[in-house]
A protein has these predicted regions:
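Surface-exposed loop and adjacent secondary-structure segments within mature catalytic domains
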Residues: 18, 60-62, 68-75, 81-91, ...
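Surface-exposed patches in mature extracellular/periplasmic domains of secreted proteins
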Residues: 53-60, 144-151, 278-283, 367-371
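Second-shell loop/turn segments in exported
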Residues: 28-34, 117-124, 198-202, 252-253, ...
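Cleavable N-terminal signal peptides
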Residues: 3, 13-16, 199
């Protein structure tokens, strides 16, 4: 009877060993006119590593020679078994050689692996700072939700651009007068590619991209990855999942529906907590069509990739008045009104969003693990037989062929003469066109590519293939 109280007391004592951000930095994360640099943040990560809920991992050196930190957070019991949970995550993601029964058994044993990063675009300072606050709360809180998250999730909290945070924070904080501090950094915040570090995750030219890709695609293969960015569209607080169409047509449908499900959990949590201003789908410009970034490349590894773009700056700002955004709709069900906005509000929103994702992963742990196996198995099966991906140009070909045939036969275009039930639709086309055009053998998906050595971009092709091999 005394065991549970003693364990709880021990957990509280463990949490008390970790200093709060204010105790360590001298200010709260999110205070106006205050930023930490990476040297300070990394030193704080080492303080957090004193907790038995954590393991601090150096995932490699940056382009400027800094150590890139990843803090793994879970329950003390899970921390002792990280190798096993990593092995389960890899086996389910690879899917090869597993039966459904074996996959379900592994899914029941494993833990949801969730990646949360921050700081990739260093001038988007909410990202790196929400990471610090989230780490602290996960390491020190003992409420029921946090303990359930720690029990069911292995959380990979990763700094995406240490060099950039060092540069940007030092530049902003160089002014003694807080009112003179500005985010007008005069040079790139990644040594070679600056903002385009988020265009490097299919080629991995930069060391940071290589470090991150190894953890994502080789070591851990998380079921969910969450990439924090800025800025939110004018008249909103943030844009998040689900995203506007089109998505890439080759995705497994489970990618799309899982993004919808996690996005709903994120939006719902903010609404429960009285945090308005979340916009989705047509409310922003973000989609899943382009696939070379930190959030989008993982889709091809069957991970649920999440992106939020939030407002916020250590220098207070104002939420813009965009009249059309004040009317609730499916994209923005809970609009935000114009107001002054403080850095801490963005930190609080970000922590809430992280908790929404982690709570979802904890609640649906075994399903997430099984789903990534199922997507992997679907991909293997798809590669073993002929498969067609339908693109708009093929749909246009059907319409063109049908119109041509109708004209040639001088048929009445107002009638459906296919003998197939159309339920009043005027765009119904006889099914024979599906086989004749959409299933044309010429349009089959490729199962492999032959690259002749004399083609002009052969070195680029070799580089790309090596990048694929490196990333698993």
């Amino acid at each position: 009877m005394l065991l549970l109280p003693m364990l709880f007391y021990a957990s509280v004592l463990q949490a008390q060993k970790v200093p709060s951000p204010k105790e360590f930095f001298g200010f709260n994360i999110g205070d106006d006119y205050k930023l930490t640099n990476y040297t300070q943040a990394s030193a704080y990560f080492k303080k957090l590593a004193a907790s038995d809920r954590t393991k601090l991992v150096d995932i490699g050196l940056t382009e400027e020679g800094r150590h890139q930190d990843m803090l793994i957070v879970s329950s003390p019991e899970n921390i002792k078994k990280l190798a096993r949970f990593k092995d389960i995550s890899q086996k389910l993601a690879h899917a090869n050689g597993l039966t459904d029964v074996q996959a379900k058994s592994l899914a029941a044993e494993g833990k949801s692996v969730v990646w949360i990063d921050g700081g990739l675009h260093a001038t988007e300072v909410v990202g790196a700072h929400q990471l610090i606050e989230t780490m602290y709360q996960l390491v020190t809180r003992n409420d029921e939700e946090t303990l359930n998250i720690l029990k069911n999730d292995v959380i990979l909290l990763t700094h995406a651009n240490p060099d950039g945070q060092e540069l940007v924070s030092n530049w902003y904080m160089r002014e003694a007068d807080p009112k003179k501090r500005k985010m007008d950094v005069p040079r790139l915040w990644q040594k070679y590619v600056g903002h385009d570090n988020n265009r490097d995750f299919y080629m991995m030219n930069m060391k940071e991209s290589q470090n991150i890709s190894k953890q994502l695609f080789v070591e851990w293969i998380p079921q969910i990855m969450y990439n924090h960015h800025q800025r939110g569209p004018a008249g909103s607080v943030l844009a998040g999942p689900p995203y506007r169409d089109p998505f890439n047509y080759v995705f497994d449908p489970l990618i799309v529906t899982s993004i919808d499900a996690v996005g709903a959990a994120m939006n719902n949590r903010l609404n429960v907590e009285g945090k308005p201003g979340y916009t989705q789908r047509a409310g922003s410009q973000f989609s899943t069509w382009w696939n070379g970034g930190l959030r989008t490349t993982p889709y091809f590894h069957n991970m649920v990739g999440l992106l939020t773009e939030i407002i916020g700056n250590p220098t207070p700002e104002t939420v813009a008045l965009v009249p059309d955004r004040l009317i609730p709709n499916g994209a923005t069900p809970n609009p935000v009104v114009p107001q002054q906005w403080h850095f801490r509000q963005s930190i609080d929103y970000s922590v809430s969003l992280n908790y929404a994702v982690l709570d979802y992963a904890a609640r649906y742990r075994s399903q997430l693990l099984y789903n990534i196996y199922k997507m992997g198995k679907n991909a293997i099966d798809r590669g073993r037989s002929d498969h067609w991906t339908f693109y708009p140009k093929y749909i246009d070909s059907i319409k063109t062929a049908y119109a041509k045939d109708k004209k040639a036969a001088k048929k009445d275009s107002s009638r459906n003469q296919s003998g197939e039930f159309s339920f009043g639709r005027e765009d119904t086309i006889p099914n024979k066109y599906y086989t004749a055009i959409l299933k044309n053998p010429v349009n089959r998906d490729a199962r492999g590519y032959i690259i002749p050595a004399n083609q002009t971009d052969f070195p680029t092709a070799v580089k790309f293939i090596n990048a694929l091999l490196y990333s698993g």
